[in-house]
Amino acid sequence: MASLSGPISPTSLEMFKPGVEEFNPSKLLLLSNHQEGLLYPTILGSLELLSFKRERSLNLQRDKVCLLHQESHLLKLRGTGTDTTDVLLKQPTAISVNCCHDGTFTTWEQDRMPKTSTAPTLTESSGSLVTRLILIPRLTLSIGIQVAMRLFRLGFRLARYSLKVTILKAQEGLLLIPDLLRVHPIEPLVQDRVVEPILAIEPLPLV
């Protein structure tokens, strides 16, 4: 007591009395922490903070430290010619920060985000697809030939006339194939064989 300067009042000596002091709401003060911008309730003559307030302040402090670290990381990129616009947009969703309870930054960790592939999915191999494209005309032609042979045997006049028109249209299409290929080229998957124009077509026996 002798080391204290100035007179000592009786009210100031009451703070150093031994024993448990009764809680007095008038002694509750709100001391502002200018560094973190938070309010800490404390009691005169006590240096301890309330547990729930302290835990809450540490959580806020942890978030502040992590945000400041992100900003400082972007500030390092400034002036080096790096565009940080995309980084600001992608960081909140693609990057998470781990901090200790005392507000100390620990590690950066990439989130496990599902990666979507933009490449087209091939359901069939190119070889099987080409084989199917080759088999389809053969099947169609075989069915058409069988139907034509039956109609020729029956001798229906209308059927023979319709077949003649169909065959003439098919011959015209075969002659136009080279010109159509220049306007509408075939896809690379099917363009394995060079289509040659048919110069002479033998006339079919139409009765």
Curated annotation (Swiss-Prot):
Classification of source organism: Viruses, Riboviria, Orthornavirae, Pisuviricota, Pisoniviricetes
Disulfide-bonded cysteines: none
Family indicated by similarity: Belongs to the coronavirus I protein family.
Main location: virion
Annotated GO CC locations: virion component
Name of the protein described by the UniProt record: Protein I
InterPro entries registered for this protein in UniProt: Corona_nucI, N2-like_embe-CoV
Pfam (any one): Corona_I
Further remark: The gene encoding this protein is included within the N gene (alternative ORF).
Job of this protein: Structural protein that is not essential for the viral replication either in tissue culture or in its natural host.
Signal peptide as annotated in the record: none
Cellular compartments annotated: Virion
Keywords: Virion
